[in-house]
Structure formats: structure tokens, C-alpha cells
Swiss-Prot record:
GO cellular component, one term: chloroplast
UniProt cross-references to InterPro entries, sorted A to Z: Domain_X, Maturase_MatK, Maturase_MatK_N
Cited function: Usually encoded in the trnK tRNA gene intron. Probably assists in splicing its own and other chloroplast group II introns.
PANTHER family reported for this sequence: MATURASE K (PTHR34811:SF1)
Recorded name of the encoding gene: matK
Protein name: Maturase K
Protein species of origin: Lepidium virginicum
Length: 504
């Protein structure tokens, strides 16, 4: 952000209050679609999705769009005329996509400035390893073995768009920008419904930003109450965005409850609480009794319904006892497993045996849900029996083999932290047999005849990749003893959920 502050012709105070003029500056569009700002996005920018502008940035589109924005009536297109209205070879959908991406970049400016100002004079530890999804599980292994219950809930998404717009009012003071954004947002959703059957590519950046802002509102209140009620003062709340009218909103929030503020804190008082969130799921682990966990459940339901005006069904909040129930989180089934140990102790001439029980976090692969995902992608049938991938038979043999091997390695990479590898071998078997049946179908042969003519080289492709990586990490003696297949391995380079997990 410091690199681009020279382009902004406002000082720090005016940037927060006057964002609307930035919509009419051409250099903002250049920054919004700069490859440096979009290198983390897996989709190419919409300027390069069109065949007419696939080689260079078109400033003509931006200039014509700015002229159109001076007259907002020209941006309003009836839904029935969306497909017929073209402007320079594009429909109005194309220009609303540009505005939505631009607004996401502009509105992030005051957020970035406030976040940077809150970090001034503080030393924050930066670690790229903490970005990995697998970094959560070592934390769970250390903490969850001492807890009894876990509160598992799905954070509700606001149904009405106006709730998301109201979230920005506490941070963006420019009324013109808010009105313009509200207008574009409703128009955006109108042609989103119109083009839903045509699978139009819609940039989700602005909706992701609004949803994260909505989550920050919820977590700021939760951590505030958590800090006030806890005996152990937590400092993790400092990484949240700076609040505007925060304490006034807290006072309004307290009016929802019949009891007073100390009574509410008394219900939530527990020094041993751990909170983990990823996307729309969050879990709350504690040593509380079932009664106190139900009070936490009551608190979350009232928080969303009374303060955020979002309907929240209590059925979406599950209270799991880790020693009996499985917790499905990030594609794993987690539970506590009792590991009995017998220790022999000798004192002088007397010896005796001591039975110790060690609690370990057991992480298993949800084979049933993954089998349904494989069946949905036509790798197997509903019973889990491998079938050929008919849509891939037009590709070359090497392309088919590389696709299956890549999927198999990604699954092995993601589920390497499983405590029981039998289900992982079952998934590999389904993919390997599906690959063989696909190649046999392409060559119009049987599986037996195809394997007999090809030899064992095909099956080795599914085994060499992961084993070669592990042999470079672990000592040769450890690798040769086959203990490697019984331990859990967490990788710190996994930034996205596996596609098979996203199906659920």
C-alpha cells in the first residue's frame, strides 16, 4: 500500500472521508488490475478474459466507463434488456464487474491505513508457516487434549444486502461512496441472477471483503467480552481492525439482554477457552460443563439474531464431547483417543507396574464423504467401486496419467496428518483403478490385457512422488523402518482446502 500512496492525492484524514472522487481517476483502475495486486488470485482479471483485450490494458474502456458514471442513469439497465445492451462490444455486466473490483480496492485503503497505524510501535512476529491450513492441527493437538467439549457452529451469512452495507458505515464516512456502492451492489445482484444459468464469471472480491468485515464485527464483540471475562488477559484481539463507535455499539448490544453486564460476564467466565475459525466455520474449545456450553450456545444465537439481525438456527450449533463424538473440521474427523501405557517402576528390591493413560488427538479421514465426492466426479460409483472417467478418454495417455497422479498426490499431501492411513490407501486404490480403467477404455481393451501389455510401470507413478519427498526429509533409518507410514506429517505449505473437501 505504501508503494501506491503517491498516487492518492489526499492526506490520511481525507482518504477516510472522501473516497468517491477516486472512482473517476484512471490510475486507480490501473492499480486495481495490476498484476502485482492480483497475483494471488487464481482467476485472470476480466480485462484479459475478453478476446479483444487479451494482450494489453485498454484505457479506452476506462475512459468511456468514467464518462458513463458521471450520468448514473445510463448505468441503470432493465433486467430484460441486459443481454441486448452493448457498449463497445460488452454488456453492462462487464462494466459492473469493473466497478465492483474497483470499489473493493478503494474501500480497502482506509482499512489498510488503520491497520497499519494500530501496529505502529509494536513488534509482531511474522511467519509464513502460520498461513498453512495444517498449522491449525498442531495447535489442536497441544490444546484439545486438555478439553472436554467443543462448540461447533457455522457463522451465518446475512441474507439481505443492506446488512452488509451497514457494516461499512462505521468505517467509511463518505456518504457518496456508500450510496454509489449500494446502487452498484443491487444492480450487480440483479444481473447475477439473470446470468446465473449462463455461468458468468463474477469477481467475488467485494463480497469476500464485505463478509470478512461482517466477521470482524462479530469477533470484535466476542473477543471484547472474552477479554473482560477471562482471568488470563489475551492480546490476540489487537490484530483486529480499529473500531469506530465500538463502545457505543457495545452499550447498545447489552440492552438486548435482560440481565446486566456483570451477570453476562459471569455466564461466560472461563480462563481456558480457545477459539479457531476458518472460512464460515468456527469452533470453541473449553473445559466447561454441558450447562455452561449451552449458555455459550445461547449467547451466540442471541448475538447474531438480536445484534446483527441475522436469523441463526440453534440447530447449527453443535456441542460435541471430544471423548465420544467426532469433530469434522477442515476435512478431518477429530476426536480424543485414550492411549493406555504401562510403566514398570523399581524401587530398591520392590518393583511394581503403573497404568498411565495419555490422551491424544485422533485425526481420521472421512472416507464416506470423500467417496461421495469421488462418485460425484465420476471416479467411482455410489458404492465406492472404481469406474472409468469417460470425459477424459479424448486426452493423451500421458495427460490422463498426469491428471490422476496429480490428484492422488494432492490427496496424499493433504491427508498426510491422518493417524490411520488405511482410508488413505483406499482412496489411492480408487484413483489408481479408475486411471487403469480409463486408459483401457480409451484403447478399447480390458483392464487385464492392458496391464499385461503395459507392465508395472503405471502403478509406480502413484507411489514414487510422495515417497521421494519424504526420503529427503527424514533419516534413512527412520524411512527404512517403515515407521514413516504410522506417523502424522503436517505440511506448512497448504493454503487451500482440497477440492474433495469443498464438495461437502
Amino acid at each position: 500500500m505504501e508503494k501506491f500512496q503517491g498516487y492518492l492525492e489526499f492526506d490520511g484524514a481525507r482518504q477516510q472521508s472522501f473516497l468517491y472522487p477516486l472512482f473517476f481517476r484512471e490510475y486507480i483502475y490501473v492499480l486495481a488490475y495490476d498484476h502485482g495486486l492480483n497475483r494471488l488470485n487464481r482467476n485472470r482479471s476480466i480485462f484479459f478474459e475478453n478476446a479483444d483485450y487479451d494482450k494489453k490494458y485498454s484505457s479506452l474502456i476506462v475512459k468511456r466507463l468514467i464518462l458513463r458514471m458521471y450520468e448514473q442513469n445510463r448505468l441503470i439497465i432493465p433486467t430484460k434488456d441486459l443481454n441486448q445492451n452493448h457498449f463497445l462490444g460488452h454488456t453492462s455486466l462487464f462494466y459492473y464487474q469493473i466497478i465492483s473490483v474497483l470499489f473493493a480496492v478503494i474501500v480497502e485503503i482506509p482499512f489498510s491505513l488503520r491497520l497499519g497505524s494500530s501496529f505502529e510501535g509494536k513488534q509482531l512476529k511474522k511467519s509464513d508457516n502460520l498461513q498453512s491450513i495444517h498449522s491449525i492441527f498442531p495447535f489442536l493437538e497441544d490444546k484439545f487434549s486438555h478439553f472436554n467439549y467443543v462448540l461447533d457452529l457455522q457463522i451465518p451469512y446475512p441474507i439481505h444486502l443492506e446488512i452488509l452495507v451497514q457494516t461499512l458505515r462505521y468505517r467509511v464516512k463518505d456518504a457518496s461512496s456508500l450510496h454509489f456502492f449500494r446502487f452498484c451492489l443491487y444492480e450487480y445482484c440483479n444481473w447475477k441472477n439473470f446470468y446465473i444459468k449462463k455461468k458468468a464469471i463474477l469477481n467475488p472480491r467485494i463480497f469476500l471483503f464485505l463478509y470478512n468485515s461482517h466477521i470482524c464485527e462479530y469477533e470484535s464483540i466476542f473477543f471484547f467480552l472474552r477479554k473482560r471475562s477471562s482471568h488470563l488477559r489475551s492480546t490476540s484481539y489487537e490484530v483486529l481492525f480499529e473500531r469506530i463507535l465500538f463502545y457505543g455499539k457495545i452499550q447498545h448490544f447489552l440492552k438486548v439482554f435482560v440481565n446486566n453486564f456483570p451477570a453476562i460476564l459471569g455466564l461466560l467466565k472461563d480462563p481456558f477457552i480457545h477459539y479457531v475459525r476458518y472460512h464460515g466455520r468456527c469452533i470453541l474449545a473449553t473445559k466447561d460443563t454441558p450447562l455452561l456450553m449451552n449458555k455459550w450456545k445461547y449467547y451466540f444465537v442471541n448475538l447474531w439474531q438480536c445484534y446483527f439481525s441475522v436469523w441463526f438456527q440453534s440447530q447449527k450449533v453443535n456441542i460435541n464431547q471430544l471423548s465420544k463424538d467426532n469433530l469434522e473440521f477442515l476435512g478431518y474427523l477429530s476426536s480424543l483417543r485414550l492411549n493406555p501405557l504401562v510403566v514398570r517402576s523399581q524401587m530398591l528390591e520392590n518393583s511394581f507396574l503403573m497404568d498411565n493413560v495419555r490422551i491424544k488427538l485422533d485425526t481420521k479421514i472421512p472416507i464416506s464423504s470423500i467417496s461421495r465426492s469421488l462418485a460425484k466426479d465420476k471416479f467411482c460409483n455410489v458404492l465406492g467401486h472404481p469406474i472409468s472417467k469417460a470425459t477424459w478418454t479424448d486426452s493423451s495417455d500421458s495427460d490422463i496419467l498426469n491428471r490422476f497422479v496429480r490428484i492422488c498426490r494432492n490427496i496424499s499431501h493433504y491427508y498426510s496428518g491422518s493417524s490411520k492411513k488405511n482410508n488413505l490407501y483406499r482412496i489411492k486404490y480408487i484413483l489408481r483403478q479408475s486411471c487403469v480403467k480409463t486408459l483401457a477404455r480409451k484403447h478399447k481393451s480390458t483392464v487385464r490385457a492392458f496391464l499385461k501389455g503395459l507392465g508395472s510401470g503405471l502403478l509406480e507413478e502413484f507411489l514414487t512422488g510422495e515417497d521421494q519427498i519424504l526420503s529427503l526429509i527424514f533419516p534413512r533409518s527412520y524411512y527404512a523402518s517403515k515407521r514413516l507410514y504410522r506417523v502424522r506429517i503436517w505440511y506448512l505449505d497448504i493454503l487451500y482446502l482440497n477440492d474433495l473437501v469443498n464438495h461437502e
